[in-house]
Amino acid sequence: MEPFIHLHVHTQYSLLDGQASIDALIDKASKDGMRAIAVTDHGVMFGIKEFFNKVNKKNSKPQGVIKDSEKALKPLLAKSDPTAEEQQQITELQEKIAEAKAAIFKPILGCECYCARHSRHSKLATQDDRSGWHLIVLAKNKNGYKNLIKMVSLSWTEGFYGRPRIDKELLEKYHEDLIVCSACLGGEIPQLILQGKQDKAEESVLWFKQLFGDDYYLEMQRHETHDPNADCTIYPHQVEVNKVLVELAHKH
């Protein structure tokens, strides 16, 4: 199996949506061989500090191994003509470092934002205006993290109407060092596809592509279930949307 990590994940901080604790998510991802996971709670970043701290604690052991091994390796590499025994030590230390680096787990900080259909300042008496399109936003680095928390803060102080909403004006202003994914069936592009508005969906793809370039991704989901208690209407819609997403991805 190709290396894989989850970039759209809700924790217990996504009220009435997520259920998994951050500890459980980190443990499950690690046991499944994943070297990273994103946390993208709905409209909030309440769990990010806990997530970051717990991953740092998990990484402390392999980081200690790397530090000690590199310290022991340095004088050996400085020798112009190491003995056979020293060469064996070098090889063993390098393997130890590589193994420890492979055990490092990466926390990806993000949020599933609600993006206003019009403006974050718009407060029309419609259900559409009270929610907003779903949009996955991930921080590439510290600057991206700062831009993300700025947008999320403004979604509460300026854009709250039913839900905390960002808008495309904020995306244009704070887009640097962010990765954006088109999200689930609640995203703008999937919704336009389901409404039969493929031209509008393509216009939206081009808007995001122009702003984020190679840091913009079309997200595909395929959640088939035969559980009689589950919502079995989701999967057929995902299949319908995925077909068009593949076409748009190949085209753009």
Describe each PLM feature range:
Residues 1-252:
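Phosphodiester-processing cores and adjacent nucleic acid-binding clamps
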